[in-house]
Swiss-Prot record:
Residues 94-117 have a biased composition (Basic residues). Belongs to the universal ribosomal protein uS13 family. InterPro entries: Rbsml_uS13_C, Ribosomal_uS13, Ribosomal_uS13-like_H2TH, Ribosomal_uS13_bac-type, Ribosomal_uS13_CS. Pfam families: Ribosomal_S13. One of its GO terms (biological process) is translation. One of its GO terms (cellular component) is cytosol. GO terms for molecular function: rRNA binding; structural constituent of ribosome; tRNA binding. Residues 94-124 are annotated as: Disordered. This is Small ribosomal subunit protein uS13. It comes from Mycoplasma pneumoniae (strain ATCC 29342 / M129 / Subtype 1) (Mycoplasmoides pneumoniae). The lineage of its organism: Bacteria, Bacillati, Mycoplasmatota, Mycoplasmoidales, Mycoplasmoidaceae. Keywords: Ribonucleoprotein, Ribosomal protein, RNA-binding, rRNA-binding, tRNA-binding. It comes from the Bacteria.
């Protein structure tokens, strides 16, 4: 396993795919990083030289990734919650934020079903 910016990336994969193991770097950003660093995206991680690793590190360090990105996302959610925004309220209640229905569905966000027993009807 090679390390880039403190993250272990797999040796056997193409560098274009391996960079996506870093939080905040998807396929398109990984392609942009490799283009700026002048590295062939089809090259395997195990075949990279130390100079190429340094070039990738220099280009990738300009982006907000891993801990910094996670911190920024958490602060944005906290800010929404503090100002009393609807989205902040939905985040606090662990419900869908973007207007999806919740009467049915939304099970991922709400968690497993909590069944409620029916009230028995008294017979006369």
């Amino acid at each position: 396993m090679a390390r880039i910016l403190g993250i272990d990336i797999p040796n056997q994969k193409r560098i274009e795919i391996a960079l996506t193991y870093i939080f905040g770097i998807g396929l398109s950003r990984s392609q942009a990083i490799l283009k700026q660093a002048n590295i062939n995206p089809d090259k395997r991680v195990k075949d990279l030289t130390e100079e190429e690793f340094v070039a990738i590190r220099n280009v990738a360090s300009a982006y907000k990734i891993e801990g910094d990105l996670r911190r920024e996302i958490a602060l944005n959610i906290k800010h929404l919650s503090e100002i009393g925004a609807w989205r902040g309220l939905r985040h606090r209640k662990n419900l869908p934020v973007r207007g999806q229905r919740t009467r049915t569905n939304a099970r991922t966000r709400k968690g497993p079903r909590k069944t409620v027993a029916n009230k028995k009807i008294e017979s006369k």
